[in-house]
Amino acid sequence: MKSVISYALYQVQTGSLPVYSSVLTKSPLQLQTVIYRLIVQIQHLNIPSSSSTHSSPF
């Protein structure tokens, strides 16, 4: 969980997520929504690597 937050903060600091950075300054509630979306996106990225066994020829 901490790694996700630090990743989000890193993205904001590097300017990769300008929209998120503007949301961060508005309200903590939206911050939770942003973190939740980041977690979903990261889990979404991890799905292909875990399901790659289905596409393997073995």
Curated annotation (Swiss-Prot):
Domain of life of the organism encoding this protein: Eukaryota
Expression triggers: By IFNA1.
Tissue: Widely expressed, highest levels found in brain, placenta, spleen, testis, and ovary. Up-regulated in some tumor cells.
Further information: Elicits IgG antibody response in a subset of polycythemia vera patients and as well in patients with chronic myelogenous leukemia and prostate cancer receiving IFNA1 or other therapy, suggesting that it is broadly immunogenic.
Protein name: Leucine zipper protein 6
Organism: Homo sapiens
